[in-house]
Amino acid sequence: MKTSAYNVYLGVVAAMLALLFVTINAAPMEADDETAENTLVAHPDGDMELSGPWDAINTAALRKLLLQLDAEDRMGGVTRSWPQAEPRGWGLRALDSRLARQWRADKRQVRFRQCYFNPISCFRK
């Protein structure tokens, strides 16, 4: 009885080792070209002096871009969460000095939100 359990245990261990070796050999390895492309290359001394001011300019431009994108995301979230009132300036006026009307979808969205949060107010008499 002990020998058969021992043989089964050895068979399972041998099968696991064989599976491990097969997966190691079958796994794709990076070629030398790919490893050469992925390694970090140090700048020569001459390039470092020239790229110093450009790095600062690039960093400032990226920071400005990220701030603008973040502000646009926040403003987009505000306008999506609740429709804003019509602006009172001259920006949305048509040629004949009438205010340009907002989309009908905004009214539907307001009605949907009112009905969702206060369903009693949406019953028609």
Curated annotation (Swiss-Prot):
Keyword Signal attributed: yes
Signal peptide, first to last residue: 1-26
GO cellular component term, pick one: extracellular region
GO biological process: negative regulation of juvenile hormone biosynthetic process; neuropeptide signaling pathway
Residues cleaved off as propeptide: 27-106
GO MF assignments: neuropeptide hormone activity
Name of protein: Allatostatin
Organism name: Spodoptera frugiperda
Organism classification: Eukaryota, Metazoa, Ecdysozoa, Arthropoda, Hexapoda
Gene: ast
